[in-house]
A protein has these predicted regions:
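Conserved small/polar residues in nucleotide/adenosyl-binding loops
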Residues: 1-5
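Outer-membrane beta-barrel channels and translocator barrels
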Residues: 14-16, 72-74, 111-115, 178-180, ...
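Surface-exposed extracellular loop regions of Gram-negative outer-membrane beta-barrel proteins
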Residues: 68-89, 101-105, 187-200, 295-301
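Membrane-embedded beta-strands of outer-membrane beta-barrel proteins
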Residues: 9, 63-65, 104-108, 171-173, ...
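Transmembrane beta-strands of outer-membrane beta-barrel proteins
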Residues: 17-22, 73-81, 117-123, 182-188, ...
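Outer-membrane beta-barrel "beta-signal"
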Residues: 110-115, 428-440
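Extracellular/periplasm-exposed beta-strand and loop segments of Gram-negative cell-envelope proteins
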Residues: 32-39, 49-56, 92-97, 134-141, ...
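Transmembrane beta-strands of outer-membrane beta-barrel pores
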Residues: 26-30, 83-87, 125-129, 190-194, ...
Length: 440
Protein backbone atom coordinates (compact mmCIF):
# COMPACT_ATOMS: atom_id res chain seq x y z
CA UNK A 1 0.00 0.00 0.00
CA UNK A 2 1.27 3.50 -0.73
CA UNK A 3 0.36 7.11 -0.04
CA UNK A 4 1.90 9.79 -2.23
CA UNK A 5 2.02 13.57 -2.06
CA UNK A 6 3.25 15.75 -4.88
CA UNK A 7 3.48 19.48 -5.54
CA UNK A 8 5.15 21.48 -8.25
CA UNK A 9 5.40 24.99 -9.62
CA UNK A 10 6.23 25.59 -13.26
CA UNK A 11 6.02 28.35 -15.82
CA UNK A 12 7.19 29.53 -19.22
CA UNK A 13 7.95 32.83 -20.87
CA UNK A 14 8.46 33.85 -24.50
CA UNK A 15 10.95 36.62 -25.27
CA UNK A 16 10.81 37.23 -29.00
CA UNK A 17 12.55 34.25 -30.64
CA UNK A 18 13.63 32.87 -27.23
CA UNK A 19 11.39 30.56 -25.18
CA UNK A 20 12.15 29.78 -21.51
CA UNK A 21 10.54 27.34 -19.07
CA UNK A 22 11.33 25.92 -15.65
CA UNK A 23 9.93 24.66 -12.42
CA UNK A 24 10.30 23.04 -9.02
CA UNK A 25 8.94 19.58 -8.24
CA UNK A 26 8.52 17.82 -4.87
CA UNK A 27 7.02 14.42 -4.08
CA UNK A 28 6.81 12.09 -1.10
CA UNK A 29 5.74 8.43 -0.96
CA UNK A 30 4.95 6.42 2.18
CA UNK A 31 5.07 2.74 1.21
CA UNK A 32 3.98 -0.34 3.13
CA UNK A 33 5.15 -3.88 2.43
CA UNK A 34 6.47 -3.36 -1.10
CA UNK A 35 9.00 -5.99 -2.21
CA UNK A 36 10.71 -6.80 -5.48
CA UNK A 37 9.12 -9.27 -7.88
CA UNK A 38 9.32 -10.18 -11.55
CA UNK A 39 7.34 -7.10 -12.60
CA UNK A 40 9.11 -4.60 -10.35
CA UNK A 41 12.91 -4.58 -10.03
CA UNK A 42 15.20 -2.05 -8.32
CA UNK A 43 16.94 0.54 -10.45
CA UNK A 44 19.67 1.98 -8.26
CA UNK A 45 21.69 1.41 -5.11
CA UNK A 46 19.34 3.39 -2.86
CA UNK A 47 16.47 1.01 -3.71
CA UNK A 48 18.34 -1.94 -2.17
CA UNK A 49 16.30 -1.52 1.01
CA UNK A 50 13.13 -2.44 -0.88
CA UNK A 51 14.18 -6.11 -0.58
CA UNK A 52 13.22 -6.02 3.12
CA UNK A 53 9.59 -5.09 2.56
CA UNK A 54 9.70 -2.70 5.54
CA UNK A 55 7.69 0.54 5.72
CA UNK A 56 9.65 3.23 3.92
CA UNK A 57 9.61 6.92 3.01
CA UNK A 58 10.81 8.14 -0.40
CA UNK A 59 11.20 11.89 -0.88
CA UNK A 60 12.24 13.60 -4.11
CA UNK A 61 13.15 17.21 -4.97
CA UNK A 62 13.66 18.36 -8.57
CA UNK A 63 14.61 21.67 -10.22
CA UNK A 64 14.48 21.88 -14.01
CA UNK A 65 14.79 24.40 -16.81
CA UNK A 66 14.41 24.55 -20.59
CA UNK A 67 15.32 27.02 -23.31
CA UNK A 68 14.65 27.08 -27.06
CA UNK A 69 15.67 29.54 -29.76
CA UNK A 70 14.50 29.99 -33.34
CA UNK A 71 17.56 30.41 -35.56
CA UNK A 72 15.51 30.58 -38.77
CA UNK A 73 12.01 29.63 -39.96
CA UNK A 74 13.32 26.09 -40.52
CA UNK A 75 15.87 25.60 -37.71
CA UNK A 76 15.29 25.52 -33.94
CA UNK A 77 17.78 24.69 -31.17
CA UNK A 78 17.16 23.91 -27.53
CA UNK A 79 18.76 22.93 -24.24
CA UNK A 80 17.33 21.60 -21.01
CA UNK A 81 18.60 20.28 -17.70
CA UNK A 82 17.54 19.32 -14.22
CA UNK A 83 18.83 18.45 -10.76
CA UNK A 84 17.11 15.76 -8.67
CA UNK A 85 17.73 14.72 -5.06
CA UNK A 86 16.10 11.49 -3.81
CA UNK A 87 15.97 10.12 -0.27
CA UNK A 88 14.90 6.56 0.64
CA UNK A 89 14.77 5.51 4.30
CA UNK A 90 13.41 2.73 6.48
CA UNK A 91 10.41 3.92 8.56
CA UNK A 92 10.33 0.86 10.81
CA UNK A 93 11.52 0.97 14.43
CA UNK A 94 14.80 -0.73 13.38
CA UNK A 95 15.95 2.01 10.96
CA UNK A 96 18.10 -0.49 9.07
CA UNK A 97 19.01 1.65 6.06
CA UNK A 98 19.00 5.15 4.60
CA UNK A 99 19.89 6.08 1.01
CA UNK A 100 20.49 9.39 -0.79
CA UNK A 101 20.98 10.04 -4.52
CA UNK A 102 21.87 13.16 -6.52
CA UNK A 103 21.32 13.35 -10.29
CA UNK A 104 22.36 16.07 -12.76
CA UNK A 105 21.13 15.85 -16.36
CA UNK A 106 21.74 18.15 -19.32
CA UNK A 107 20.77 17.74 -22.98
CA UNK A 108 20.66 19.74 -26.19
CA UNK A 109 19.21 19.32 -29.64
CA UNK A 110 18.47 20.81 -33.05
CA UNK A 111 15.41 20.43 -35.31
CA UNK A 112 15.24 21.12 -39.06
CA UNK A 113 11.72 21.43 -40.51
CA UNK A 114 10.43 21.19 -44.06
CA UNK A 115 6.83 21.38 -45.25
CA UNK A 116 6.02 17.72 -44.55
CA UNK A 117 9.18 16.47 -42.82
CA UNK A 118 11.24 17.04 -39.69
CA UNK A 119 14.79 16.00 -38.87
CA UNK A 120 16.28 16.14 -35.39
CA UNK A 121 19.47 15.33 -33.48
CA UNK A 122 20.13 15.45 -29.75
CA UNK A 123 22.76 14.60 -27.14
CA UNK A 124 22.40 14.10 -23.39
CA UNK A 125 24.68 13.60 -20.38
CA UNK A 126 23.72 12.35 -16.91
CA UNK A 127 25.81 12.17 -13.73
CA UNK A 128 24.47 10.30 -10.67
CA UNK A 129 26.00 9.77 -7.21
CA UNK A 130 24.48 7.64 -4.45
CA UNK A 131 25.16 6.74 -0.83
CA UNK A 132 23.55 4.01 1.27
CA UNK A 133 24.11 3.38 4.99
CA UNK A 134 23.20 -0.04 6.35
CA UNK A 135 23.15 -1.53 9.86
CA UNK A 136 25.33 -4.64 9.46
CA UNK A 137 24.17 -6.02 12.84
CA UNK A 138 20.72 -6.61 11.40
CA UNK A 139 19.73 -10.21 10.73
CA UNK A 140 17.70 -9.13 7.70
CA UNK A 141 19.54 -9.41 4.41
CA UNK A 142 19.84 -6.33 2.26
CA UNK A 143 20.25 -6.90 -1.49
CA UNK A 144 21.56 -4.99 -4.45
CA UNK A 145 20.89 -5.73 -8.10
CA UNK A 146 23.84 -5.80 -10.54
CA UNK A 147 23.04 -7.11 -14.01
CA UNK A 148 19.75 -8.75 -13.23
CA UNK A 149 20.75 -10.78 -10.16
CA UNK A 150 20.27 -10.03 -6.49
CA UNK A 151 23.44 -10.23 -4.40
CA UNK A 152 23.24 -10.14 -0.59
CA UNK A 153 25.18 -7.15 0.67
CA UNK A 154 26.40 -9.22 3.66
CA UNK A 155 28.99 -10.70 1.33
CA UNK A 156 30.69 -7.32 1.62
CA UNK A 157 31.42 -8.16 5.25
CA UNK A 158 31.93 -5.31 7.68
CA UNK A 159 30.47 -2.68 5.36
CA UNK A 160 28.17 0.00 6.69
CA UNK A 161 28.49 2.62 3.93
CA UNK A 162 28.07 2.02 0.19
CA UNK A 163 28.67 4.53 -2.58
CA UNK A 164 28.06 4.44 -6.32
CA UNK A 165 28.75 6.79 -9.18
CA UNK A 166 27.28 6.62 -12.65
CA UNK A 167 27.85 8.48 -15.91
CA UNK A 168 25.67 8.26 -19.01
CA UNK A 169 26.16 9.74 -22.50
CA UNK A 170 23.75 9.28 -25.38
CA UNK A 171 22.99 10.56 -28.88
CA UNK A 172 19.78 10.31 -30.89
CA UNK A 173 18.65 10.89 -34.49
CA UNK A 174 14.98 11.34 -35.45
CA UNK A 175 12.96 11.76 -38.64
CA UNK A 176 9.24 12.41 -39.00
CA UNK A 177 7.00 12.45 -42.07
CA UNK A 178 3.66 14.27 -41.82
CA UNK A 179 0.73 13.67 -44.19
CA UNK A 180 -2.92 14.66 -44.07
CA UNK A 181 -4.25 11.50 -42.37
CA UNK A 182 -1.09 9.75 -41.21
CA UNK A 183 2.41 10.32 -39.86
CA UNK A 184 5.56 8.19 -39.54
CA UNK A 185 8.27 8.67 -36.92
CA UNK A 186 11.71 6.98 -36.57
CA UNK A 187 14.18 7.27 -33.69
CA UNK A 188 17.68 5.73 -33.63
CA UNK A 189 19.45 5.94 -30.28
CA UNK A 190 22.90 5.02 -28.90
CA UNK A 191 24.03 5.27 -25.28
CA UNK A 192 27.06 4.33 -23.21
CA UNK A 193 27.00 4.13 -19.42
CA UNK A 194 29.53 3.52 -16.65
CA UNK A 195 28.60 2.58 -13.07
CA UNK A 196 30.84 1.85 -10.07
CA UNK A 197 29.73 0.63 -6.62
CA UNK A 198 32.34 0.87 -3.88
CA UNK A 199 31.67 -0.14 -0.26
CA UNK A 200 33.92 1.22 2.48
CA UNK A 201 35.82 -0.96 5.00
CA UNK A 202 34.66 -4.18 3.34
CA UNK A 203 37.52 -6.61 3.81
CA UNK A 204 38.87 -7.79 0.48
CA UNK A 205 35.63 -7.42 -1.51
CA UNK A 206 35.72 -3.80 -2.58
CA UNK A 207 32.83 -3.49 -5.04
CA UNK A 208 32.17 -3.79 -8.77
CA UNK A 209 31.97 -1.70 -11.89
CA UNK A 210 29.68 -1.97 -14.90
CA UNK A 211 29.93 -0.68 -18.46
CA UNK A 212 26.93 -0.63 -20.77
CA UNK A 213 26.48 -0.01 -24.49
CA UNK A 214 22.96 0.26 -25.86
CA UNK A 215 21.53 0.78 -29.33
CA UNK A 216 17.80 0.99 -29.94
CA UNK A 217 15.23 1.77 -32.60
CA UNK A 218 11.71 3.06 -32.02
CA UNK A 219 9.07 3.66 -34.66
CA UNK A 220 5.58 5.09 -34.55
CA UNK A 221 2.92 4.99 -37.25
CA UNK A 222 -0.16 7.15 -36.60
CA UNK A 223 -3.33 7.13 -38.69
CA UNK A 224 -6.47 9.22 -38.17
CA UNK A 225 -9.93 8.35 -39.47
CA UNK A 226 -12.64 10.85 -38.53
CA UNK A 227 -12.81 10.70 -34.69
CA UNK A 228 -10.54 7.62 -34.42
CA UNK A 229 -6.76 7.64 -33.99
CA UNK A 230 -4.66 4.45 -34.37
CA UNK A 231 -1.01 4.22 -33.28
CA UNK A 232 1.36 1.28 -33.90
CA UNK A 233 4.74 1.40 -32.12
CA UNK A 234 7.45 -1.22 -32.77
CA UNK A 235 10.60 -1.04 -30.63
CA UNK A 236 13.86 -3.01 -30.62
CA UNK A 237 16.74 -2.58 -28.18
CA UNK A 238 20.12 -4.35 -27.86
CA UNK A 239 22.29 -4.02 -24.74
CA UNK A 240 25.76 -5.33 -24.02
CA UNK A 241 26.97 -4.96 -20.43
CA UNK A 242 30.07 -6.13 -18.59
CA UNK A 243 30.58 -6.07 -14.81
CA UNK A 244 33.84 -6.71 -12.97
CA UNK A 245 34.39 -7.56 -9.31
CA UNK A 246 37.42 -5.71 -7.95
CA UNK A 247 39.35 -7.43 -5.13
CA UNK A 248 41.59 -5.28 -2.94
CA UNK A 249 43.68 -5.69 0.18
CA UNK A 250 44.83 -3.31 2.88
CA UNK A 251 48.53 -4.02 3.58
CA UNK A 252 48.37 -2.50 7.08
CA UNK A 253 45.89 -2.19 9.90
CA UNK A 254 45.62 1.57 9.42
CA UNK A 255 42.19 2.64 8.22
CA UNK A 256 43.77 5.43 6.17
CA UNK A 257 46.13 3.15 4.24
CA UNK A 258 45.80 2.90 0.47
CA UNK A 259 43.95 -0.16 -0.80
CA UNK A 260 45.70 -2.09 -3.57
CA UNK A 261 43.92 -4.15 -6.21
CA UNK A 262 45.26 -7.71 -6.42
CA UNK A 263 42.61 -9.27 -8.68
CA UNK A 264 39.76 -8.34 -11.00
CA UNK A 265 37.12 -10.91 -11.92
CA UNK A 266 34.55 -10.79 -14.65
CA UNK A 267 31.47 -10.86 -12.43
CA UNK A 268 29.02 -10.77 -15.30
CA UNK A 269 28.65 -10.26 -19.03
CA UNK A 270 25.24 -9.73 -20.56
CA UNK A 271 23.77 -9.46 -24.03
CA UNK A 272 20.12 -8.50 -24.05
CA UNK A 273 17.65 -8.21 -26.93
CA UNK A 274 14.26 -6.64 -26.25
CA UNK A 275 11.47 -6.45 -28.82
CA UNK A 276 8.15 -4.74 -28.21
CA UNK A 277 5.00 -4.05 -30.18
CA UNK A 278 2.15 -1.90 -28.89
CA UNK A 279 -1.14 -0.66 -30.33
CA UNK A 280 -3.24 2.24 -29.12
CA UNK A 281 -6.69 3.33 -30.31
CA UNK A 282 -8.55 6.46 -29.20
CA UNK A 283 -11.99 7.79 -30.09
CA UNK A 284 -12.67 11.49 -29.45
CA UNK A 285 -16.04 13.20 -29.02
CA UNK A 286 -15.98 16.99 -28.59
CA UNK A 287 -19.65 17.72 -29.24
CA UNK A 288 -21.46 20.14 -26.93
CA UNK A 289 -19.90 21.25 -23.66
CA UNK A 290 -18.24 17.88 -22.95
CA UNK A 291 -15.00 16.37 -24.21
CA UNK A 292 -14.94 12.55 -24.14
CA UNK A 293 -12.23 10.09 -25.18
CA UNK A 294 -12.15 6.30 -25.16
CA UNK A 295 -8.63 4.86 -24.93
CA UNK A 296 -7.44 1.29 -25.45
CA UNK A 297 -3.81 0.15 -25.25
CA UNK A 298 -2.36 -3.34 -25.65
CA UNK A 299 1.28 -4.34 -25.85
CA UNK A 300 3.65 -7.29 -25.84
CA UNK A 301 7.31 -7.31 -24.83
CA UNK A 302 9.78 -10.18 -25.18
CA UNK A 303 13.17 -10.10 -23.49
CA UNK A 304 16.05 -12.47 -24.24
CA UNK A 305 19.04 -12.50 -21.89
CA UNK A 306 22.26 -14.38 -22.55
CA UNK A 307 24.72 -13.67 -19.78
CA UNK A 308 27.46 -15.04 -17.62
CA UNK A 309 26.95 -14.33 -13.91
CA UNK A 310 29.75 -15.75 -11.80
CA UNK A 311 29.95 -18.72 -11.60
CA UNK A 312 27.00 -19.53 -13.88
CA UNK A 313 26.16 -19.21 -17.56
CA UNK A 314 22.50 -18.25 -17.86
CA UNK A 315 19.92 -18.00 -20.64
CA UNK A 316 16.77 -16.14 -19.64
CA UNK A 317 13.51 -15.56 -21.52
CA UNK A 318 10.85 -13.19 -20.26
CA UNK A 319 7.50 -12.19 -21.75
CA UNK A 320 5.24 -9.37 -20.61
CA UNK A 321 1.71 -8.49 -21.75
CA UNK A 322 -0.04 -5.29 -20.72
CA UNK A 323 -3.43 -3.84 -21.56
CA UNK A 324 -5.57 -0.91 -20.45
CA UNK A 325 -9.04 0.43 -21.20
CA UNK A 326 -9.83 3.95 -20.02
CA UNK A 327 -12.49 6.61 -20.47
CA UNK A 328 -11.63 10.32 -20.25
CA UNK A 329 -14.31 12.96 -19.71
CA UNK A 330 -13.72 16.72 -19.43
CA UNK A 331 -16.67 18.78 -18.20
CA UNK A 332 -16.80 22.56 -18.59
CA UNK A 333 -18.28 24.11 -15.46
CA UNK A 334 -19.60 27.68 -14.96
CA UNK A 335 -17.07 30.54 -14.80
CA UNK A 336 -14.58 28.63 -17.01
CA UNK A 337 -13.92 25.95 -14.38
CA UNK A 338 -12.99 22.50 -15.69
CA UNK A 339 -13.37 19.03 -14.21
CA UNK A 340 -11.69 15.95 -15.73
CA UNK A 341 -12.33 12.30 -14.80
CA UNK A 342 -10.46 9.21 -16.09
CA UNK A 343 -11.48 5.73 -14.79
CA UNK A 344 -9.48 2.76 -16.11
CA UNK A 345 -9.02 -1.01 -15.92
CA UNK A 346 -5.58 -2.53 -16.59
CA UNK A 347 -3.75 -5.85 -16.53
CA UNK A 348 -0.07 -6.78 -16.58
CA UNK A 349 0.98 -10.42 -16.92
CA UNK A 350 4.49 -11.80 -17.24
CA UNK A 351 6.42 -15.04 -17.19
CA UNK A 352 10.08 -15.92 -16.95
CA UNK A 353 12.18 -19.01 -17.62
CA UNK A 354 15.85 -19.52 -16.92
CA UNK A 355 18.43 -22.22 -17.75
CA UNK A 356 21.66 -22.29 -15.76
CA UNK A 357 25.03 -24.05 -16.05
CA UNK A 358 27.63 -23.88 -13.29
CA UNK A 359 31.29 -23.24 -14.13
CA UNK A 360 34.46 -23.72 -12.16
CA UNK A 361 35.52 -21.10 -9.62
CA UNK A 362 37.75 -18.42 -11.09
CA UNK A 363 41.28 -18.39 -9.68
CA UNK A 364 44.50 -16.55 -10.27
CA UNK A 365 47.96 -16.53 -8.72
CA UNK A 366 47.02 -14.34 -5.76
CA UNK A 367 43.58 -15.46 -4.68
CA UNK A 368 40.14 -16.73 -5.56
CA UNK A 369 36.64 -15.34 -5.36
CA UNK A 370 33.49 -17.06 -4.16
CA UNK A 371 30.28 -15.12 -4.61
CA UNK A 372 26.94 -16.45 -3.42
CA UNK A 373 23.96 -15.79 -5.67
CA UNK A 374 20.41 -15.63 -4.41
CA UNK A 375 17.64 -15.56 -7.01
CA UNK A 376 14.07 -14.34 -6.90
CA UNK A 377 12.52 -17.17 -8.89
CA UNK A 378 10.95 -20.43 -7.76
CA UNK A 379 13.32 -23.35 -8.41
CA UNK A 380 11.71 -26.20 -10.36
CA UNK A 381 14.70 -28.49 -10.74
CA UNK A 382 18.47 -28.31 -10.91
CA UNK A 383 18.77 -26.57 -14.28
CA UNK A 384 15.42 -24.88 -14.81
CA UNK A 385 13.74 -21.97 -13.04
CA UNK A 386 10.31 -20.51 -13.80
CA UNK A 387 8.09 -17.76 -12.42
CA UNK A 388 4.83 -16.13 -13.49
CA UNK A 389 3.12 -13.02 -12.16
CA UNK A 390 -0.13 -11.22 -12.99
CA UNK A 391 -1.37 -7.82 -11.81
CA UNK A 392 -4.99 -6.76 -12.35
CA UNK A 393 -6.11 -3.34 -11.23
CA UNK A 394 -8.68 -0.57 -11.45
CA UNK A 395 -7.89 3.10 -11.05
CA UNK A 396 -9.30 6.57 -11.42
CA UNK A 397 -7.89 10.07 -11.88
CA UNK A 398 -9.71 13.36 -11.30
CA UNK A 399 -8.52 16.93 -11.93
CA UNK A 400 -10.21 20.23 -11.12
CA UNK A 401 -8.94 23.53 -12.55
CA UNK A 402 -10.10 27.03 -11.53
CA UNK A 403 -8.90 30.15 -13.43
CA UNK A 404 -7.58 32.90 -11.16
CA UNK A 405 -6.09 35.22 -13.79
CA UNK A 406 -5.61 35.16 -17.55
CA UNK A 407 -2.15 33.62 -17.02
CA UNK A 408 -2.77 31.77 -13.74
CA UNK A 409 -5.02 28.94 -12.61
CA UNK A 410 -5.08 26.58 -9.63
CA UNK A 411 -6.68 23.29 -8.74
CA UNK A 412 -6.08 19.78 -7.49
CA UNK A 413 -5.48 16.24 -8.73
CA UNK A 414 -6.79 13.07 -7.08
CA UNK A 415 -5.66 9.55 -8.01
CA UNK A 416 -6.48 6.14 -6.59
CA UNK A 417 -5.88 2.50 -7.50
CA UNK A 418 -6.65 -1.02 -6.27
CA UNK A 419 -4.54 -3.98 -7.45
CA UNK A 420 -4.66 -7.77 -7.15
CA UNK A 421 -1.26 -9.42 -7.73
CA UNK A 422 -0.31 -13.10 -7.99
CA UNK A 423 3.42 -13.94 -7.98
CA UNK A 424 2.75 -16.79 -7.04
CA UNK A 425 0.96 -15.76 -3.81
CA UNK A 426 -2.06 -13.54 -4.17
CA UNK A 427 -1.90 -10.09 -2.58
CA UNK A 428 -4.30 -7.14 -2.57
CA UNK A 429 -3.04 -3.57 -2.36
CA UNK A 430 -3.87 -0.01 -3.25
CA UNK A 431 -2.85 3.59 -2.94
CA UNK A 432 -3.92 7.18 -3.35
CA UNK A 433 -2.45 10.52 -4.37
CA UNK A 434 -3.66 14.07 -3.72
CA UNK A 435 -1.91 17.12 -5.22
CA UNK A 436 -2.50 20.87 -5.17
CA UNK A 437 -1.34 22.36 -8.48
CA UNK A 438 -0.66 25.86 -9.82
CA UNK A 439 -0.56 26.38 -13.60
CA UNK A 440 1.25 29.37 -15.12
Amino acid sequence: MCIRDRDYVSGNRKLGLLWLAGGIDWSQSLLEGRKWNLLSQPDYLITAGDSLGEPQRIEKYRIYGQAAYVLSPKIKVGIDGDYTATSNEDRSSYHIYHGMAHLIRISGGIVYEQVRRRFGASIHYTHRTEELTYDTDSKDKLYTFPLGYWLPMQELSGSFLFRSQGKRLGVSLQTETLKEHWSLFHDLFYETQQLADNPNNSGNLRGWEERLHQISYQGRFTRTNKSWTHIWSPTARFNQTTANRILQRNPTTSSSAIWTTFATYRLARQRMLSTQLSYEATKNDTSGEKVSTWQMTVGWNRLENDFYIYPFTVKQYTGLFHGEIAFFRQIRLPKENKLSIRPSVYIVSGYGTEIKWEKETQKDENGSAEIKLEQNMQKVNEDFIARTATRLGIGTEMEYRHPIHSALSAGFRLKGSLEQTTSPQSTLGGGGNFSIVIWL
